[in-house]
Protein backbone atom coordinates (compact mmCIF):
# COMPACT_ATOMS: atom_id res chain seq x y z
CA UNK A 1 0.00 0.00 0.00
CA UNK A 2 1.55 3.26 -1.19
CA UNK A 3 1.51 6.21 1.23
CA UNK A 4 0.85 9.61 -0.34
CA UNK A 5 1.51 13.06 1.12
CA UNK A 6 -0.43 15.63 -0.90
CA UNK A 7 1.66 18.67 0.15
CA UNK A 8 4.80 16.89 -1.10
CA UNK A 9 3.05 15.98 -4.37
CA UNK A 10 1.91 19.61 -4.79
CA UNK A 11 5.49 20.82 -4.20
CA UNK A 12 6.95 18.29 -6.65
CA UNK A 13 4.31 18.73 -9.39
CA UNK A 14 2.96 22.31 -9.04
CA UNK A 15 2.08 22.66 -12.74
CA UNK A 16 0.44 19.25 -12.99
CA UNK A 17 -1.92 18.98 -10.02
CA UNK A 18 -5.28 20.56 -9.32
CA UNK A 19 -6.35 20.90 -5.68
CA UNK A 20 -9.95 20.40 -4.59
CA UNK A 21 -11.58 23.10 -2.49
CA UNK A 22 -11.15 22.08 1.18
CA UNK A 23 -14.56 20.63 1.98
CA UNK A 24 -13.78 16.92 2.40
CA UNK A 25 -13.08 14.89 5.53
CA UNK A 26 -11.41 11.52 5.91
CA UNK A 27 -13.82 8.77 7.01
CA UNK A 28 -11.91 5.66 5.87
CA UNK A 29 -9.44 3.34 7.51
CA UNK A 30 -6.62 4.46 5.21
CA UNK A 31 -5.34 7.98 5.83
CA UNK A 32 -3.86 8.29 2.35
CA UNK A 33 -4.77 6.72 -0.96
CA UNK A 34 -4.44 7.29 -4.67
CA UNK A 35 -5.10 5.71 -8.01
CA UNK A 36 -6.74 5.85 -11.40
CA UNK A 37 -10.13 7.55 -11.50
CA UNK A 38 -13.40 5.72 -12.15
CA UNK A 39 -16.37 8.11 -12.00
CA UNK A 40 -20.05 7.91 -11.11
CA UNK A 41 -22.57 10.73 -11.39
CA UNK A 42 -25.71 10.11 -9.33
CA UNK A 43 -28.13 11.86 -7.00
CA UNK A 44 -29.44 10.21 -3.84
CA UNK A 45 -29.19 6.77 -5.48
CA UNK A 46 -26.12 4.60 -4.82
CA UNK A 47 -27.02 1.74 -7.21
CA UNK A 48 -23.98 2.44 -9.43
CA UNK A 49 -21.70 2.67 -6.38
CA UNK A 50 -22.88 -0.79 -5.30
CA UNK A 51 -22.23 -2.18 -8.80
CA UNK A 52 -18.71 -0.74 -9.01
CA UNK A 53 -17.42 -1.78 -5.57
CA UNK A 54 -18.34 -5.37 -6.45
CA UNK A 55 -15.78 -5.23 -9.29
CA UNK A 56 -11.97 -5.44 -9.08
CA UNK A 57 -10.70 -2.01 -8.03
CA UNK A 58 -6.97 -2.63 -7.73
CA UNK A 59 -5.12 0.64 -8.39
CA UNK A 60 -8.38 2.57 -8.76
CA UNK A 61 -10.30 5.25 -6.87
CA UNK A 62 -14.06 5.61 -7.24
CA UNK A 63 -15.01 9.29 -7.57
CA UNK A 64 -18.72 9.79 -6.91
CA UNK A 65 -20.43 13.05 -7.82
CA UNK A 66 -23.49 12.86 -5.61
CA UNK A 67 -24.45 16.44 -6.35
CA UNK A 68 -23.29 17.49 -2.88
CA UNK A 69 -26.49 16.13 -1.34
CA UNK A 70 -26.53 16.22 2.45
CA UNK A 71 -29.86 14.34 2.70
CA UNK A 72 -28.66 10.71 2.60
CA UNK A 73 -25.51 8.57 2.50
CA UNK A 74 -24.05 7.17 -0.72
CA UNK A 75 -21.69 4.78 1.13
CA UNK A 76 -22.03 2.71 4.27
CA UNK A 77 -20.20 -0.13 5.99
CA UNK A 78 -21.31 -2.95 3.68
CA UNK A 79 -20.27 -1.22 0.45
CA UNK A 80 -17.01 0.03 2.01
CA UNK A 81 -16.17 -3.53 3.09
CA UNK A 82 -16.89 -4.79 -0.46
CA UNK A 83 -14.66 -2.04 -1.87
CA UNK A 84 -11.83 -3.06 0.48
CA UNK A 85 -12.30 -6.76 -0.32
CA UNK A 86 -12.15 -6.04 -4.06
CA UNK A 87 -8.96 -3.98 -3.83
CA UNK A 88 -10.26 -0.43 -4.32
CA UNK A 89 -7.72 2.13 -3.13
CA UNK A 90 -10.43 4.54 -2.01
CA UNK A 91 -13.52 6.60 -2.72
CA UNK A 92 -14.00 10.36 -3.02
CA UNK A 93 -17.67 11.15 -2.48
CA UNK A 94 -19.26 14.53 -3.16
CA UNK A 95 -22.00 13.62 -0.72
CA UNK A 96 -22.39 11.78 2.58
CA UNK A 97 -21.41 8.46 4.15
CA UNK A 98 -22.76 6.54 7.14
CA UNK A 99 -21.64 3.83 9.58
CA UNK A 100 -18.61 6.00 10.27
CA UNK A 101 -17.42 3.96 13.27
CA UNK A 102 -17.07 0.94 10.97
CA UNK A 103 -15.69 2.90 7.99
CA UNK A 104 -12.70 4.07 10.03
CA UNK A 105 -11.81 0.40 10.66
CA UNK A 106 -12.17 -0.64 7.00
CA UNK A 107 -9.04 -0.93 4.85
CA UNK A 108 -10.13 1.55 2.20
CA UNK A 109 -9.73 5.30 1.88
CA UNK A 110 -12.90 7.41 2.06
CA UNK A 111 -13.15 11.17 1.63
CA UNK A 112 -16.64 12.68 1.82
CA UNK A 113 -18.49 15.84 2.82
CA UNK A 114 -20.23 14.60 5.98
CA UNK A 115 -21.99 11.71 7.67
CA UNK A 116 -25.73 11.09 7.48
CA UNK A 117 -27.66 8.11 8.91
CA UNK A 118 -30.23 7.79 6.08
CA UNK A 119 -29.62 5.40 3.17
CA UNK A 120 -30.34 6.25 -0.47
CA UNK A 121 -33.06 5.01 -2.76
CA UNK A 122 -32.07 2.23 -5.18
CA UNK A 123 -33.55 3.16 -8.56
CA UNK A 124 -30.66 2.09 -10.79
CA UNK A 125 -30.07 5.69 -11.86
CA UNK A 126 -26.60 7.11 -12.44
CA UNK A 127 -23.91 7.56 -15.07
CA UNK A 128 -20.62 5.65 -15.13
CA UNK A 129 -17.28 6.96 -16.41
CA UNK A 130 -18.35 10.46 -17.40
CA UNK A 131 -16.42 13.64 -16.58
CA UNK A 132 -17.70 15.10 -13.30
CA UNK A 133 -16.96 18.50 -11.78
CA UNK A 134 -17.13 19.48 -8.12
CA UNK A 135 -14.99 21.32 -5.55
CA UNK A 136 -13.51 23.41 -8.38
CA UNK A 137 -11.98 20.44 -10.24
CA UNK A 138 -13.04 18.24 -13.16
CA UNK A 139 -12.44 14.50 -12.72
CA UNK A 140 -11.95 12.53 -15.93
CA UNK A 141 -11.99 8.73 -16.05
CA UNK A 142 -8.45 7.42 -16.45
CA UNK A 143 -6.79 10.40 -14.74
CA UNK A 144 -5.44 10.13 -11.19
CA UNK A 145 -6.54 11.30 -7.75
CA UNK A 146 -4.56 11.37 -4.50
CA UNK A 147 -5.92 12.07 -1.02
CA UNK A 148 -4.72 12.33 2.57
CA UNK A 149 -5.65 14.30 5.69
CA UNK A 150 -4.30 17.47 4.02
CA UNK A 151 -6.61 17.38 1.02
CA UNK A 152 -7.43 15.86 -2.35
CA UNK A 153 -5.57 16.49 -5.62
CA UNK A 154 -6.06 15.44 -9.25
CA UNK A 155 -3.44 14.83 -11.95
CA UNK A 156 -3.76 13.87 -15.62
CA UNK A 157 -0.97 11.30 -15.14
CA UNK A 158 0.30 9.10 -12.30
CA UNK A 159 2.53 10.78 -9.70
CA UNK A 160 5.45 9.35 -7.75
CA UNK A 161 6.19 10.46 -4.21
CA UNK A 162 9.40 12.57 -4.20
CA UNK A 163 12.40 11.11 -2.38
From Swiss-Prot:
User: Which InterPro entries does the entry mention?
Assistant: RraA (IPR010203), RraA/RraA-like (IPR005493), RraA/RraA-like_sf (IPR036704)
| Gene3D superfamilies reported for this sequence | Ribonuclease E inhibitor RraA/RraA-like
Q: Where does substrate bind?
A: 76-79, 98
User: In its UniProt record, which GO terms are filed under biological process?
Assistant: regulation of RNA metabolic process
Name the UniProt key words of this record, in alphabetical order.
Lyase, Metal-binding
* Cofactors that this protein relies on: a divalent metal cation
Entry cofactor note text? Divalent metal cation.
Molecular function GO labels: 4-hydroxy-4-methyl-2-oxoglutarate aldolase activity; metal ion binding; oxaloacetate decarboxylase activity; ribonuclease inhibitor activity
Enzyme class at the top of the EC tree:
lyase
Domain of life according to the entry: Bacteria
Function noted in UniProt: Catalyzes the aldol cleavage of 4-hydroxy-4-methyl-2-oxoglutarate (HMG) into 2 molecules of pyruvate. Also contains a secondary oxaloacetate (OAA) decarboxylase activity due to the common pyruvate enolate transition state formed following C-C bond cleavage in the retro-aldol and decarboxylation reactions.
The protein's matches in PANTHER family, at most eight in alphabetical order, are given as: 4-HYDROXY-4-METHYL-2-OXOGLUTARATE ALDOLASE 3-RELATED, REGULATOR OF RIBONUCLEASE ACTIVITY A
Q: Which family does it belong to?
A: Belongs to the class II aldolase/RraA-like family.
Protein name in UniProt: Putative 4-hydroxy-4-methyl-2-oxoglutarate aldolase
Amino acid sequence: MQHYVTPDLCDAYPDLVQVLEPMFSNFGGRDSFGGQIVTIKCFEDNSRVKEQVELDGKGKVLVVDGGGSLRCALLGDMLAEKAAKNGWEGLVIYGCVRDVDVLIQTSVGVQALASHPMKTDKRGIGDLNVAVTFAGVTFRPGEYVYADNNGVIVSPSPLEMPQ
